Amino acid sequence: MSASGGQVAANMPANTARRSLPWPAPAKLNLFLHILGRRADGYHELQTCFQFVDLCDEITIDVRMDGRIRRVAEIAGVAEDDDLCVRAARALQTAAACAMGGDIGVLKRIPLGGGLGGGSSDAATCLVALNHLWKLHWPVDALAALGLKLGADVPVFIRGRVAWAEGIGERLTALYPPLAPSESNYLIIKPNIGVDTAGIFQDPELTRNSAPITIHGFLASGGRNDCLSVVRRRHPEVARALDWLSGFGPARLTGTGACVFLGLESTEQGREIVGELPPALKAFLVRGMNDSPLLARLAIG
């Protein structure tokens, strides 16, 4: 199941060099989120574990020889100059002094304002794809550093591996067995609202003094989401969705929401739960992925 989204333009402009196959931009889940403190610059020190899921936006890029960067379809509520894909493309073009451009299409499946990282993932996919299509040969560390300027979540999508994250989310430790989480099935529930991340982190009642934990501690205890109490208070729709989903198991909030999720024993269990879904909620049956599908797409060129 997936949300509907924008369209990709059907016709290739005459000044376009070539059209590539679509590039996936996966959603992520925060399997836990602890906030350790606030830095002098206003950002928060945190710990989290990012895992990808197979709910993906789809990015298409037609390379242009005239240097113009253009979004070829509207995304509701997102102006072109604010679009992270466009900003990512322009940032890479400037940093690399590249004369080429691109027509960028985004087919949205990841809901906006859900805590699933859709915008950051789209930006990361654009950086990885354009680095390949423009033949820049930037190393992944350089791409991740550029991506960090666009958002704290962008580097994990560029690196493409399930990760333990610290700092503002940019200090990443890739996780491999036995430390990697299982690639479980999940049911993600989205209430019909979006959550303003900045508003949650600015709330005076936000927990900001959690003690640091280790990866082994997370694997043993599972952790929690320190944003949960503030999100519940500010957004009753999220609270109701979480309470409903918690009737089927230990439901969690991802990021600052609005999405909540539940690990499943089977896809059949997920389908049974969806059969009882209240009409105000959207459901996404997904599978956890420890390697981003973007890496597989990059491998085929």
PLM feature spans:
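ATP-binding N-lobe of GHMP and related small-molecule kinases
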Residues: 2-114, 132-140, 178-180, 190-192
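ATP-dependent small-molecule kinase catalytic core of the GHMP/sugar-kinase superfamily
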Residues: 2-5, 9-24, 30-45, 136-250, ...
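Conserved hydrophobic residues forming the short capping helix/wall of the S-adenosyl-L-methionine
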Residues: 89-93, 131, 249, 274-277
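Short aromatic/hydrophobic contact patches that present stacked aromatics
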Residues: 113, 188, 259-261
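DPxDG-like acidic metal-binding loop motif
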Residues: 114-140, 156-158
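Glycine-rich beta-strand-to-loop/alpha-helix junction loops that act as flexible
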Residues: 118-119, 254-258
